[in-house]
From Swiss-Prot:
Localization per Swiss-Prot or TrEMBL: Plastid, Chloroplast
This protein's name: 9,13-epoxylabda-14-ene synthase, chloroplastic
Any Gene Ontology CC annotation: chloroplast
Residue span of motif DDXXD motif: 322-326
Residues that, per the record, bind Mg(2+) 3: 466, 470, 474
Protein species of origin: Marrubium vulgare (White horehound)
Tissue note: Present in both leaves and flowers, with higher levels in leaves.
A GO MF term: miltiradiene synthase activity
Residues the entry annotates as binding Mg(2+) 2: 322, 326
Gene name of the record: ELS
UniProt-listed GO biological process terms: gibberellin biosynthetic process; miltiradiene biosynthetic process
Length: 580
């Protein structure tokens, strides 16, 4: 016996969507589910959780039978379920349930007696990673025994590797040891071709390649492709009476709806770019598509359209003006842009001195005024002075860098790093986008030491990694770079090779990443977690762009990721119900 019901994906609502010109129509998918299905998710807490009912409530669907209740049994299944929801990009619909499950998991973790978490290696590794990422205080010492285990199961080794990447402190030697052991073993399995499971093989390759450069939505698309019709049976059970292949189809539909909106945002960016006449400039990089891709990769939620657009516009403007300071304009013209922003007043065309200066300044002027008006509605106060201040700050940093290499000013590495983190552009992009997350941000919050530290750490990561990949080019251009300064600082000592200097700079980037993670994962801070997560996502952009090349200037892997994230919908195959 089987039943048929309609899973209705309703239009998304929220501040960002309500102001958009376009809306998405409701989409209905007919799903047939067998009442004989034994798809059971086992949960290990003392209150039943109706995941199926919650799903119906979120997406506005209706079913022909009462809500399905999931009964508590197994903590391992709970954790696998959370991991699956995250990997398929639909965890945002289940945050209250996830929070409940993790709270229960944390209570078990704190128990001194041995329980199921510590008896199962994979369960312990997943629990540690999910709890730490959520902000719970969990010691890595609980993982210490596993570093000496003779583990042959590749999936378990992979979970230990992922857990080791949650290292926050320099003295967490357990995680350092676990990382070295697990990564070497996984690489050996790849070299030997000893992972027969295709999906697992691909996962190991992906996580080993650039773990901290994995962008949220890029990873979601990859998971959906791996969990295609041939592998949907590998998805952990979600709810009794809701077959896993139906859940996969829902996740695919959700992805395609988000993608459709991101395509529309690309059209909006292209219209804005042309309206600003930035397409008439005959120098520098056109990064409209790159900006749209990067913001779509870190802001997946449909309601964050305004945040994505604000972030993307600032990536484009900062890149255009940075290129102007570096190559496109004269020193006097570059100074003129800073003077105009400080004055913040439109002028007759002849007073700008050049067409390029006029285009760049008016693009900044009109864009900031427009964003400030929208932010006023969101925040309930005027934020234009802050937005102008951010532009003065980054342009001043550009000027300082311009002066340092044109006048051949001798800088130490510390002097360089004290200001160069601003010029990478993370601060201005992030603080603009935060205005549109539906969270009120006071002036005190934005001027706090915590805000400065978050900006400095994420910017330092991106700056240092950028310097490693652009060192040889910038050396030819006689431009100051942290790798070159590192070499110069050790010139009188033992010989330091370029590889040594690059390794040292990468270690500094990892240090700032861990400091950033400490703030993001800490409870009771000035910023709510939703805001702090943005800094962590931007940190991943740095690793994505600059881990093995300069993907921002010469995209290679990004071209493929851009196709799958922005342009190519997930193909939804008709899936038959599972009858047991």
């Amino acid at each position: 016996m089987s039943i048929t019901f309609n899973l209705k994906i309703a239009p998304f609502s929220g501040p960002g969507i309500q102001r958009s010109k376009e809306t998405f129509p409701a989409t209905e998918i007919q799903i047939t589910a067998s009442t004989k299905s034994t798809m059971t998710t086992k949960c290990s807490f003392n209150a039943s959780t109706d995941f199926m009912g919650k799903l119906r409530e979120k997406v506005g669907g209706k079913a022909d039978k009462p809500p399905v209740v999931i009964h508590p049994v197994d903590i391992s299944s709970n954790l696998c379920m959370i991991d699956t929801l995250q990997s398929l990009g639909v965890d945002r619909y289940f945050q209250s349930e996830i929070n409940t499950l993790l709270e229960h998991t944390y209570r078990l973790w704190k128990e001194k007696k041995k329980n199921i978490i510590f008896k199962d290696v994979s369960c312990c590794a997943i629990a540690f990673r999910l709890l730490r990422e959520k902000g719970y205080q969990v010691s890595s010492d609980k993982l210490a025994p596993f570093a000496d285990y003779r583990i042959r199961d590749v999936a378990t080794i992979l979970e230990l590797y992922r857990a080791s990447q949650a290292r926050l402190y320099e003295d967490e030697h357990t995680l350092e040891k676990l990382h070295d052991w697990s990564s070497n073993l996984l690489k050996q399995h790849l070299l030997n071709g000893s992972i027969p499971d295709h999906k697992l093989h691909k996962q190991v390759e992906y996580f080993l390649k650039n773990y901290h450069g994995i962008l949220d939505r890029v990873a979601v698309r990859r998971s959906l492709d791996l969990y295609n019709i041939n592998h949907h049976h590998r998805i952990p059970d979600v709810a009794d009476g809701f077959p896993k292949e139906d859940f996969l189809e829902y996740s695919m539909q959700d992805f395609n709806i988000c993608q459709a909106q991101q395509q529309e945002e690309l059209h909006q960016l292209q219209r804005w770019y042309a309206d600003c006449r930035l397409d008439t400039l005959n120098y520098g990089r056109d990064v409209v598509r790159i900006a749209n891709f990067l913001t779509s990769a870190i802001f997946g939620e449909p309601e964050f359209s305004d945040a994505r657009l604000a972030f993307a516009k600032h990536i484009i403007l900062v890149t255009r003006i940075d290129d102007f300071f570096d190559h496109g304009g004269s020193r006097e013209e570059s100074y003129k842009i800073l003077d105009l922003v400080q004055e913040w007043k439109e002028k007759p065309a002849e007073e700008y001195g050049s067409k390029e200066v006029e285009i760049l300044f008016t693009a900044v002027y009109n864009t900031v005024n427009d964003l400030a008006e929208k932010a006023h509605i969101e925040q309930g106060r005027c934020v234009k002075p802050l937005l102008i201040k951010l532009w003065v700050e980054i342009l001043t940093s550009f000027k300082k860098e311009l002066d340092s290499w044109t006048e051949e000013t001798a800088l130490t590495l510390d002097e360089y790093l004290s200001s160069s983190w601003v010029s990478i552009g993370c601060r201005i992009c992030i603080l603009n986008s935060l205005q549109y997350l539906g969270i009120k941000l006071s002036e005190e919050m934005l001027s706090s030491q915590e805000c400065t530290d978050l900006c400095r750490h994420v910017s330092s990561v991106d700056r240092l990694l950028n310097d490693v990949q652009t060192f040889k080019k910038e050396r030819l251009e006689n431009t100051i770079n942290s790798v070159g300064l590192q070499l110069a600082a050790h010139k009188g000592e033992r010989a330091m090779t370029e590889e040594d200097a690059m390794s040292k700079i990468k270690e500094m980037a990892d240090y700032h990443r861990r400091k950033l993670m400490q703030i993001v994962y800490k409870e009771g801070t000035v910023f709510p977690r939703e805001c702090k997560d943005v800094f962590l996502r931007v940190c991943r952009i740095g690793y994505y762009l600059y881990s093995s090349g300069d993907e921002f200037t010469s995209p290679q892997q990004m071209k493929e990721d851009m196709k799958s994230l922005v342009y190519q919908p997930v193909k939804i195959h008709p899936l038959e119900a599972i009858n047991v």
